[in-house]
Amino acid sequence: MANIKSAKKRAVTSEKRRKHNASRRSMMRTFIKKVYAAIATGDKAAAQNAFNEMQPLVDRQAAKGLIHKNKAARHKANLTAQISKMA
C-alpha cells in the first residue's frame, strides 16, 4: 500500500474509476449480447431494434475512451452484416 498521501488518493480514485468502467463495460456487453440473441432467434425486426439501442451506447463508450473506436466500429460492422444477411 502507498505511503505518500497523493499516492493513497490515486489508489482510491483509481479503484473508483475501475469499478465505474467495469460497470459501463458490462452494460455495453449486455446490449451487444441482446443483439446476438435476437439474431439467433431469426427475428430481423427484433434484431434491428436491439441494434438500434446498442449502436449509440457503443459509440458513446468509444467517444469516452472506454473502448477503442475501431472496436466499436468492428462490433457495429459485424452485427450489421449479420442482420442484413437475415431473410
Swiss-Prot record:
Domain of life: Bacteria
Gene3D superfamilies xrefs: Ribosomal protein S20
Biological process per Gene Ontology, one example term: translation
InterPro entries: Ribosomal_bS20, Ribosomal_bS20_sf
Any GO molecular function: small ribosomal subunit rRNA binding
Pfam families tied to this protein: Ribosomal_S20p
Protein keywords: Ribonucleoprotein, Ribosomal protein, RNA-binding, rRNA-binding
Stretch forming the signal peptide: none
Region (Disordered) residue spans: 1-27
GO cellular component: cytosol; small ribosomal subunit
Membership in a protein family: Belongs to the bacterial ribosomal protein bS20 family.
Matches recorded under PANTHER family: 30S RIBOSOMAL PROTEIN S20, SMALL RIBOSOMAL SUBUNIT PROTEIN BS20C
Function of the molecule: Binds directly to 16S ribosomal RNA.
UniProt protein name: Small ribosomal subunit protein bS20
Organism: Erwinia tasmaniensis (strain DSM 17950 / CFBP 7177 / CIP 109463 / NCPPB 4357 / Et1/99)
